[in-house]
Swiss-Prot record:
Its main location: secreted. This is Calcitonin-3. Disulfide bonds join C1-C7. GO terms for molecular function: hormone activity. The modification Proline amide is found at P32. It comes from Oncorhynchus kisutch. It holds the Pfam family Calc_CGRP_IAPP.
Length: 32
């Protein structure tokens, strides 16, 4: 990655998107 901040932000957003799309089975009220 060229920019660490941008790369981390992208990874974070991707992870958040995955968490939001996945069914809430293991994560109770962890995701808003």
């Amino acid at each position: 990655c060229s920019n660490l901040s941008t790369c981390m932000l992208g990874k974070l957003s991707q992870d958040l998107h995955k968490l939001q799309t996945f069914p809430r089975t293991n994560t109770g009220a962890g995701v808003p």
